[in-house]
Amino acid sequence: MLGKEEEFTCKQKQCLSHFVTNLTSDVFALKNLPEVVKGALFSKYSRSVLGLRALLLKEFLSNEEDGDVCDEAYDFETDVQKAADFYQRVLDNFGDDSVGELGGAHLAMENVSILAAKVLEDARIGGSPLEKSTRYVYFDQKVRGEYLYYRDPILMTSAFKDMFLGTCDFLFDTYSALIPQVRAYFEKLYPKDSKTPASAYATSLRAKVLDCIRGLLPAATLTNLGFFGNGRFWQNLIHKLQGHNLAELRRLGDESLTELMKVIPSFVSRAEPHHHHHQAMMQYRRALKEQLKGLAEQATFSEEMSSSPSVQLVYGDPDGIYKVAAGFLFPYSNRSLTDLIDYCKKMPHEDLVQILESSVSARENRRHKSPRGLECVEFGFDILADFGAYRDLQRHRTLTQERQLLSTHHGYNFPVELLDTPMEKSYREAMERANETYNEIVQEFPEEAQYMVPMAYNIRWFFHVNARALQWICELRSQPQGHQNYRTIATGLVREVVKFNPMYELFFKFVDYSDIDLGRLNQEMRKEPTT
């Protein structure tokens, strides 16, 4: 290969071997380096003629006085400070925010309400969250005699304390009591056959039970989350949390900053309260919210608000299908996008179909993604569905989602499997009690009242999404192992798009419209070892 060959002394090679995965290839990874050093190193890399190994030696591994290099027990304390000074200079003085993406950290957040978890997971770019699942883990445990739900300090010092605690306990009591009842009911309804492994049957049955009763869990229910994020992600998230109206989220912002300052201080220092960037950001967020909230409250409507669960296409592009076809052709053409769109508009219908079909004909499963040209069209949807389904769909990040406050105003989703069974009465009693308590609290504490709302209650939110991201979401979330509620939303999204223009159906060939009883059974059976 042509390129500048780097030559290192034996001692330099010995030193470098502790910090890079190889000494000769053009492709190598870094190891055993602090995050701030790795980030500063890559940032300097973009403005240097040196290779990364030589730059690492020059900037961080060589003694500035005599040029000697490190040994295996090298102490990075000086280099960490040097890198930190570099970050302060670049971030603060030049505002080059992208260098904050060159290092990151893992952060665990435990005993967080599922209401707060959604705010944390709203942060889309640069971070990856994982959350304890309400579909596979029972939430009936007690610690020191108390169920695991968040006790908001404002509610705990208000006149609603006893009402809130009593209703949450009632919801958890109902949830716990229904577990064995629903399990026994499903064991009779879906008996295990001789060919089904016991462990696969037990896992799929448990998922079915939890799918039915998770709607009883209030938004105050405690969960655990794990995040990996780059420095820019953490800084933006902390800014958001520190300015939130809920005390829980402000506390999480402060505690996250404290812990991240121990591992990636240079990446998050601008979120410290005394920093001028932080003060300006807080003022901006506060003013923005106050202005938009005031304008929204002035809006009046003559029609009654619909509270029926629905998926509604609000807007789409009538010329979108031509833009998609042009987008498919563009990488293989030398003409402008405008020329190609005009070309596709004027061609015979069968020729347009041929272009569209050629982009999907080779797809053998949902992981075979369509070309990026499918991103040339976007849709907007208004969705009203249960909070549990929202929690599952909200984790998709290649789209725009906004939600309204969680409330009991739009009714709740009752699991159809429990209709006309002995369990229906206790489930509905719990829902009604939660509704009554919410209506009392919301008059004085509209945001804190959300903690009271069970997951079965409906919430309104919108999707603004390109067709390629929609393809991924709908083909994934319609699979048999998914929860029936979000499967219904996924198929509803596709139906709305196909109604808008039937030609889009080509791109959703792996959407599963089937009704499945024990949805996870086939997947669990695939996990069983063959004999």
UniProtKB/Swiss-Prot annotation:
<keyword id="KW-0677">Repeat</keyword>
<dbReference type="GO" id="GO:0004799">
    <property type="term" value="F:thymidylate synthase activity"/>
</dbReference>
<dbReference type="GO" id="GO:0050797">
    <property type="term" value="F:thymidylate synthase (FAD) activity"/>
</dbReference>
<dbReference type="GO" id="GO:0070402">
    <property type="term" value="F:NADPH binding"/>
</dbReference>
<dbReference type="InterPro" id="IPR036098">
    <property type="entry name" value="Thymidylate_synthase_ThyX_sf"/>
</dbReference>
<protein>
    <recommendedName>
        <fullName>UPF0159 protein CPn_0746/CP_1126/CPj0746/CpB0774</fullName>
    </recommendedName>
</protein>
<feature type="domain" description="ThyX 2">
    <location>
        <begin position="309"/>
        <end position="511"/>
    </location>
</feature>
<dbReference type="InterPro" id="IPR003669">
    <property type="entry name" value="Thymidylate_synthase_ThyX"/>
</dbReference>
<dbReference type="GO" id="GO:0050660">
    <property type="term" value="F:flavin adenine dinucleotide binding"/>
</dbReference>
<dbReference type="Pfam" id="PF02511">
    <property type="entry name" value="Thy1"/>
</dbReference>
<comment type="similarity">
    <text>Belongs to the UPF0159 family.</text>
</comment>
<feature type="domain" description="ThyX 1">
    <location>
        <begin position="38"/>
        <end position="274"/>
    </location>
</feature>
<dbReference type="GO" id="GO:0006231">
    <property type="term" value="P:dTMP biosynthetic process"/>
</dbReference>
